[in-house]
A protein has these predicted regions:
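Nucleotide/phosphate-binding catalytic cleft detector across ATP-hydrolyzing
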Residues: 1-17, 23-206
């Protein structure tokens, strides 16, 4: 088997209550992604997206990964992990920063997002995603892409997605026990939206 190159391969593991699904995708030169490996195995170690049996969940992950490796003809060393469940939380936040050079640059956007996500998150929750909803420049709202725009004050309205710290740690333990590294956790609903919706549809809240 050949080693998976992070530049060419993407591996996702969907930790579901009824089954574990592992997918290996290859990025092509034209920007499209092709599924080259798929593995599934029944899961009995989770309930409502929460691990209730680490050993059972670990074995299901191993089985699904082995099947995906066999189909793709590669070795999987790391993966993105889909996460869902009743422990997922969402809240809105805002941030404000001065525009340093009179024109919005990447650094300004990074700073305003950091400011927006600095709000207090419960100790038992872990930040998953910071999703920009809207930008405001000098009280002009409705801005979707602020880069290059002139102004002195940049605001950002964002949606923060969090998950249970304990739940994510237990899933991480199962992935690690399966011999894999976790690239990051991804909200399953968000991943699904990117696979089936256009950017305009996501902006409209479809």
């Amino acid at each position: 088997m050949s080693n998976v190159s992070k530049n060419e391969m993407l591996v996702g593991v969907d930790i579901g209550t009824s089954k574990i699904v592992a997918i290996v995708a290859e990025t092509r030169g034209d920007g499209l992604i092709e599924i080259i490996g798929l593995g599934t195995f029944p899961s009995k170690g989770l309930k409502n997206g929460v691990v209730v049996d680490i050993e059972s969940t670990t074995q299901a992950i191993k089985k699904s990964i082995a099947e995906a490796e066999s189909m793709a003809g590669c070795h999987i060393g790391s993966c993105y992990v889909g996460i869902s469940g009743s422990h997922i939380r969402g809240l809105n936040s805002e941030g404000v920063v001065p525009i340093r050079d009179g024109e919005v640059r990447y650094g300004d956007v990074d700073r305003v997002i950091e400011t927006a996500q600095a709000m207090a998150i419960p100790a038992d929750q872990k930040l998953l995603h910071v999703l920009p909803r809207d930008y405001i420049i000098d009280k002009q709202d409705g801005i979707k892409e602020p880069l290059g725009m002139a102004g002195s004050r940049l605001e950002a309205k964002v949606h923060l997605v969090t998950c249970s710290e304990n739940s994510s740690q237990n899933i991480h333990k199962c992935i690690s026990a399966s011999g894999l590294d976790v690239e990051s956790f991804v909200l399953e609903q968000l991943a699904s939206s990117y696979s089936v919706l256009t950017s305009d549809e996501r902006d409209l809240g479809v």
